[in-house]
Every structure is written in structure tokens, then in C-alpha cells.
Amino acid sequence: MSQEKNTYTHINHVRLTMNTRDLSDDVIFSIKKNKSLSIYGGIPENILLDLAEIIKDIDGFKLIVILEDNSSNDSINSLDILSFLPNIHHLDILVHQATPLSHIDALDHINDLRTFTISGNLNKNIDFSPLRKFDKISSLYVNDLIFPDKYYDIINNNPIENLSLRKVVLANLDKKNSMKNLEVLNELIDEQTLASKFPNINHLSLTNCRKLSDFLFLSCLNLERLDINTVKGLISIPKLKSETLHTLQILNCQNLEDISYIYDLKNLKNLAITSSKVDFQNISDVFFKLSLQNFYFLSNKNKENEMFENLAIKHKVNNSAM
């Protein structure tokens, strides 16, 4: 029995390294069952060859590649491992190495990429053009640098459903009916066109968007979930369409004062408000005007937190972070 037997017997996700010497039956079973694995740092060539045979017929396989500086002459390192695994559909790249990653040319080896995530130590001029060969990408996540406008054709030419970027310039994007989830981590430009660009969006997340000050565009969206985190320009919650919205999170928006329109959201089930200027009486009123399942609240004042906990218990509403 393989020496790695005990390591992998009870885990749900397999992680292979340059120290991996063989693939036990338990490891192979887990790989096939979960349709995913992680490769950390590098992996011996013979293991890669075995792995390629194991996953070649698995539809929807996900590979997580962690790039780091420890390497071995006996292992295949960096993104070169992709040349052995052309049939993966989902790829996450985490760059932990000291040298910034400057290219992703190895994606040329992949036949049919469906989702792509990259994060960590990336060169600000990294070339994303290898993504242009694909036309079935449904999820794109690039969070640790700005995804340049010159690569927006990649978004326009794929059926993107889930998009997460630091900066989004809507004027450079085509109308996309497929878009369901949008996460913006720093800057949203031309926000007033969001409803026309992505008419079917149902989840919007805005984080640290310091230039946003007019939030009326939110009133045009048929959202199921809205997350706003650390947005200083948010002073009042705009009128939102209430038919579909079930989850609303307003976190660390320190200038927020007015939540009166929240009372109209009769289908809302999950609400979170933290670190705001909202008067506690207005927070208390939420319990009487909405039928929530979960209401998470955090104030800078301990007394308000204590009063809120008592209200949550009284009204039998969960008080936990979402």
C-alpha cells in the first residue's frame, strides 16, 4: 500500500506535491469523485503522466495550481504541468512565488477552458491573450491587478456568467444576457448603464468602490443578492426592486445613515449592516417591519450590540455573519 495512503484516506480534496511518489487507490478515488485536485509547487513527471490518464475522460475537472519557489529537478514546475493535462475545464492559479508571474502561455495546451481564476503575485503587465483561444468561459476572476481594457474582447466573446475584477469599465463591454454575478473590487465606471449591459444580473458585489456616490442605478436591477462593502459614498440605501431581493449586506459603509427603503423589501430574508451611522431605532424597526431569517448587525457601541442581540432572540431571528 502506498505511503500516502494514510494522508489521503479521510480527505475530500487531494493535494499533490514534488514529494508525491505514487497515487494510492484512495487518492485516485478522491480525484475521480471530487473531479478536482491541487498541485503545490511541482510534481514528478511520472505522477503527471499517471494523472493525465486518470482524468482524461472526466468532464468538468478542476485543477488548482499553487506556484511557489520550492522546486526540484525531479519535478515538473510552474505552469508547465498544463502540457500534461489538456483536458481540464476549470483552472485556478495561485501565485505564491517571489517572482511575479508575467505570462500564462501554458494555457495554449488546454483544449476547452470553462472557468479561470488567477491571484497572487502577478506582473502588472501580464499577458492575458492566451485566453482568447477559448469561447466557452463562464467564470473569470482576476482580483489582484487591474484586468486591462485591451483584453475586454475575452469577456465579450465568451458566455460569461460570473465576473470578478478590480476595475470594470462598462462602456467597453458588450451587452451580455448571460451575466449573472458581478463582483467589483475597486472601481465601477459607467455604472448607470449596468442594467442595460447585464439585464439578467442577479448578484452584485461592490467593494471599496471609492468613486461611487450615486447609487440610483441599483434601482433598475432585478437582484436576488446585493453586497456593498467599504463604500464611503453610500449615505442612503436607494429604492430597490423588492420582488426578487432576498439577501442584502451593507458592511463597513461608515457614512450610511438612511435605510428607510429597506422596510419596503418584503421578500428580504437575510440582512447585514455593520459599522454605519444608522440610528439604532431604525435598526430596531427592521424587526417589526420585515420577516427576516437572519439579521447580522455590528456597531462600534457595545451597548447597541447587546440590545440588538436581545432583539434578535426576542424575534427569533438568527444573528450570524453571512
Model-derived regions, located:
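Long, acidic/polar, low-complexity amphipathic helices and coiled-coil-like
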Residues: 104, 126-131
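Concave beta-strand-loop units of leucine-rich repeat
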Residues: 12-24, 33-50, 61-77, 81, ...
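Short, contiguous, helix-prone interaction/anchoring segments in small proteins
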Residues: 52-58
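Core hydrophobic positions of leucine-rich repeats
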Residues: 82, 107, 131, 217-218, ...
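Conserved acidic
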Residues: 1
